[in-house]
């Protein structure tokens, strides 16, 4: 552990700039529209309207928590039980079948880090998740996560996913 502390300090020093949480890092979407304004087709990723926590349907919130981080409201960015469960499941399977990252860790990675699987990135993800947990309420973390997470079919955010999959806003 004595060697781990300087390494964590070095990784903390090398963190990305996190001063502007609200910064928009989204890529452009190209929309082809008819003369009457109807969208004919879209190219690239789709981003929906930003929804505040109270605007997001409770069943969406509960579903994401149930799937991604059952103890979200009980931890401070790291879920040791969830991490241990994932390690055991992966060892039994002999491959990666389950992740142990919390919603806060996933948000830290999605907002600030690359998807590379390195020890450095994992330490930075953990440090950033602690920072998010100190800076934001659980509801704010969920709102940012649900507005920025990838839901498939090129849809980023719960509103874009709802529009893409169901044809209406969340």
Residue ranges and their predicted role:
Residues 1-170:
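Juxtamembrane regions of bacterial inner-membrane/periplasmic proteins
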């Amino acid at each position: 552990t004595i060697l781990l502390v300087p390494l964590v300090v070095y990784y903390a020093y090398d963190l990305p700039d996190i001063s502007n949480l609200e910064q928009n890092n989204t890529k452009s979407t190209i929309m082809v529209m008819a003369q009457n304004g109807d969208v004919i087709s879209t190219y690239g990723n789709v981003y929906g309207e930003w929804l505040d926590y109270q605007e997001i349907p409770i069943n969406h919130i509960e579903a994401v928590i149930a799937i991604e981080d059952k103890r979200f409201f009980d931890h401070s960015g790291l879920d040791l039980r969830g991490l241990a469960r994932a390690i055991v499941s992966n060892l039994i399977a002999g491959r990666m079948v389950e992740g142990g990252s919390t919603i806060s860790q996933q948000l830290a990675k999605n907002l600030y880090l690359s998807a590379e699987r390195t020890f450095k990135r994992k330490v930075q993800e953990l440090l950033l998740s602690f920072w998010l947990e100190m800076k934001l309420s659980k509801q704010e973390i969920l709102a940012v996560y649900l507005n920025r997470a990838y839901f498939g079919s090129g849809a980023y955010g719960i509103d874009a996913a709802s529009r893409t999959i169901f044809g209406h806003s969340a």
